[in-house]
């Protein structure tokens, strides 16, 4: 294991915010880290941005995939980088999100305070096209896995990937990131899995999660990948059942499927997947009434 403590892994494809993202990593007040910037065969020229921001910093390294991986599987690129990581902890960063300068400094304090936890998290704010739409609420500094699950996807919490710090060897032992379509729920599944020994969270917001028209997560691009998103829902629920031997416990998940995911599909596919959710025994509370139909028509009349 490398003596350096942390590695930022930065799978990169978009140029728009890369300079700001890399600058926020370079400007960390805690200096014991290194960075692998991995160009996913982008059609945009990312290397000059890398050279401008951090080309002279020996902690940073740049590589480029011979072929694009993210178009087929974002998670395969993540896991390739996890394989390259040789430090005790890793952060799966991105090409457009921003860290506060004391992000790593505060994370290291939590590492020292809670050495047995395998997962740490910075509180976050979510931006959509430049506007704040969600901030983390009150979250305890330490939570057991059960306590974390009471918050996850239910309480006021920004769900994303790049604000987590993972213990590298444990992530590898648990099988890396699960590969769901468009990487939907891959981060959530990993966070849940890695929280077995608890999770430590910063008291302040130290991370900005950016959603723009270039993200798969934005509504416009999600609609293009709606069927993959619904399939990822099913894969996540299957994964949860395999690891925890019970159905995913929260009604909020069913609400999201009913209100957001299924109505984005063409009608016949919507009905097909609705039946699949019911057949597998997931979310019996998905109601056989007009709610999904109402949302289906509403989306098409906008």
Locate predicted features:
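Conserved nucleotide-sugar donor-binding catalytic segment
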Residues: 11, 143-223
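Membrane-interface aromatic/basic loop that binds lipid-linked glycans or pyrophosphate carriers
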Residues: 1, 260-302
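Glycine-rich, basic loop-to-helix element that forms the pyrophosphate-binding segment
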Residues: 66-85
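Short, well-formed alpha-helical segments that are part of the catalytic scaffolds
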Residues: 14-27
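Acidic donor-binding segment of Leloir-type glycosyltransferases
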Residues: 26-66
């Amino acid at each position: 294991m490398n003596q350096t403590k942390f590695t930022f892994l930065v799978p990169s494809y978009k140029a728009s915010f890369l300079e700001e993202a890399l600058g926020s990593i370079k400007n960390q007040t805690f200096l014991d880290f290194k960075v692998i910037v991995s160009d996913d065969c982008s059609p945009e020229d990312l290397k000059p941005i890398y050279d401008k921001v951090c080309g002279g910093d020996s902690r940073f390294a740049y590589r480029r995939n011979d072929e694009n991986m993210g178009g087929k599987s974002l998670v395969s690129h993540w896991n390739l980088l996890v394989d390259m990581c040789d430090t005790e902890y890793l952060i799966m960063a991105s090409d457009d999100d921003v860290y506060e300068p004391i992000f790593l400094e505060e994370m290291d304090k939590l590492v020292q305070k809670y050495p047995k936890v395998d997962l740490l998290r910075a509180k976050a704010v979510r931006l959509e096209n430049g506007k704040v739409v969600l901030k983390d609420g009150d979250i305890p500094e330490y939570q057991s896995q059960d306590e974390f699950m009471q918050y996850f996807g239910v309480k006021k919490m920004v769900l994303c990937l790049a604000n987590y710090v993972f213990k590298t060897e444990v992530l590898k032992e648990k099988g890396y990131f699960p590969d769901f379509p468009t990487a939907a729920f891959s981060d959530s599944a990993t966070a849940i899995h890695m929280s077995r020994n608890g999770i430590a969270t910063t008291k302040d917001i130290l991370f900005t999660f950016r959603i723009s028209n270039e993200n798969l997560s934005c509504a416009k691009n999600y609609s293009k990948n709606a069927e993959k998103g619904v399939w990822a829902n099913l894969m996540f629920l299957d994964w949860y059942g395999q690891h925890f031997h019970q159905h995913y416990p929260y009604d909020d998940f069913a609400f999201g499927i009913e209100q957001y995911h299924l109505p984005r599909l063409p009608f016949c596919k919507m009905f097909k997947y609705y039946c699949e959710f019911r057949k597998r025994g997931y979310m019996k509370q998905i109601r056989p009434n007009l709610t999904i139909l109402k949302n289906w028509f509403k989306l098409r009349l906008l």
